């Protein structure tokens, strides 16, 4: 398979799409994940963190690492894909993007496996020292993924290309592959196949969880509520994977082949457009991950519900106070002026 020479491809719609999408994700993601960390710090002493809570906190931290780089990417796309910031920040942004993506995949995977064990082996899971295992697994995940991502810190991450007007040059960030590079292709094949291996394991575990829960007889209303929440959690995890991660990894390998020059220019443009959309979908996991926590921990869900009803009550009280004042003031203003003089 010989590489073809092809001109630089661009998808100009991304200069409008990314600043809008990333701005929304940044605001919602910082609020949601910041609130999650605050709730965990307030409700749970560190010594009482079980395995599932350890994974949740680590997943939130991975999301926050990506969120702090979003302003850098917003500036980049607002400048028509021109990296005007210091070069090392491009390396940092690319490194944290990789860390967030695959830490999220890994922690969602171990969360799913935790629930799989809880459903299929409830007694053994209840007796196990899951806190120690949670800490150990989290350390392994961070060391492995940060170690792999450190490559992006030493990589020559920027390259110069002519701008769309042809009047000058722009500096791209992580948008250049050497044509025909077999090592780059092998790395991407490994990443994509590793992802789909994890996804198939998660899909299998979730299907077993759903089947087991549906086969269990429901004897009490409380058990029905627990089962409903567990099913929603499973569906939410699958939705996050299918919406955020699967489209990107379906497109990633064909896009890499096109970038390396192994596909014709017509296909290259189409796959590049699709790649930009999947990058946007990939970043939405920072907003969707906190939704999973509502189905995983009772205290978190209770705290969120109490805050919601507290806000509603405050609005009702405020509205009632305003109505009362209006009822008093309006009749007073309708009193004839001559009667006030008597």
UniProtKB/Swiss-Prot annotation:
Sugar-modified residues: 169
GO cellular component: membrane; plasma membrane; secretory granule membrane; tertiary granule membrane
Topology in membrane: Multi-pass membrane protein
Gene Ontology terms, MF aspect: G protein-coupled purinergic nucleotide receptor activity; G protein-coupled receptor activity; lipopolysaccharide binding; lipopolysaccharide immune receptor activity; phospholipid binding; platelet activating factor receptor activity
Pfam families found in the cross-reference section: 7tm_1
Domain of life: Eukaryota
Disulfide bonding pattern of the chain: 90-173
CDD domains referenced in this protein's UniProt entry, alphabetically: 7tmA_PAFR
Transmembrane annotation, as ranges: 17-38, 55-74, 92-113, 134-155, 185-205, 234-254, 277-296
Positions in the Extracellular compartment: 1-16, 75-91, 156-184, 255-276
Secretion signal span: none
UniProt record, GO biological process: chemotaxis; G protein-coupled receptor signaling pathway; immune response; inflammatory response; inositol trisphosphate biosynthetic process; phospholipase C-activating G protein-coupled receptor signaling pathway
Subcellular location: Cell membrane
Cytoplasmic side: 39-54, 114-133, 206-233, 297-342
PROSITE patterns: G_PROTEIN_RECEP_F1_1 (PS00237), G_PROTEIN_RECEP_F1_2 (PS50262)
Expression by tissue: Expressed in the placenta, lung, left and right heart ventricles, heart atrium, leukocytes and differentiated HL-60 granulocytes.
Functional summary from the UniProt entry: Receptor for platelet activating factor, a chemotactic phospholipid mediator that possesses potent inflammatory, smooth-muscle contractile and hypotensive activity. Seems to mediate its action via a G protein that activates a phosphatidylinositol-calcium second messenger system.
Subunit text: Interacts with ARRB1.
This protein's name: Platelet-activating factor receptor
Organism of derivation: Homo sapiens
């Amino acid at each position: 398979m010989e590489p073809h020479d092809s001109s630089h491809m661009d998808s100009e719609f991304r200069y409008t799409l990314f600043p809008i999408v990333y701005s929304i994700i940044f605001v919602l993601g910082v609020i949601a994940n910041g609130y999650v960390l605050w709730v965990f710090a307030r409700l749970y002493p560190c010594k009482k963190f079980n395995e599932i809570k350890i994974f949740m906190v680590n997943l939130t931290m991975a999301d926050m690492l990506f969120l702090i780089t979003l302003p850098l990417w917003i500036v980049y796309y607002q400048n028509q894909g021109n990296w005007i910031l210091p070069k090392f920040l491009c390396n940092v942004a690319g490194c944290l993007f990789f860390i967030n993506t695959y830490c999220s995949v890994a922690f969602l995977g171990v969360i799913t496996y935790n629930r799989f064990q809880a459903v299929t082996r409830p007694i053994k899971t209840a007796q196990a020292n899951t806190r120690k295992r949670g800490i150990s697994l989290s350390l392994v995940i961070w060391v492995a993924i940060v170690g792999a991502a450190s490559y992006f810190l030493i990589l020559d991450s920027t390259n110069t290309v002519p701008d769309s007007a042809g009047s000058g040059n722009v500096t791209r960030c992580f948008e250049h592959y050497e044509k025909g590079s077999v090592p780059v292709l092998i790395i991407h094949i490994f990443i994509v196949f590793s992802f789909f291996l994890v996804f198939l394991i998660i899909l299998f575990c979730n299907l077993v969880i759903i089947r087991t829960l549906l086969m269990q007889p429901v004897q009490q209303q409380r058990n029905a509520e627990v089962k409903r929440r567990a099913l929603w959690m499973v569906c939410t995890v699958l939705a996050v994977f299918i919406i955020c991660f699967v489209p990107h990894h379906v497109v990633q390998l064909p896009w890499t082949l096109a970038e390396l020059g192994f596909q014709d220019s017509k296909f290259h443009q189409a796959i590049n457009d699709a790649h930009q959309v999947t990058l946007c979908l990939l970043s939405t996991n920072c907003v969707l991950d906190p939704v999973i926590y509502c189905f995983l921990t009772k205290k978190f869900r209770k705290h969120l519900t109490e805050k919601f009803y507290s806000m509603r009550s405050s609005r009702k009280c405020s509205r009632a106070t305003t109505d009362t004042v209006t009822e008093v003031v309006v009749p007073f203003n309708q009193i004839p002026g001559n009667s006030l003089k008597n």
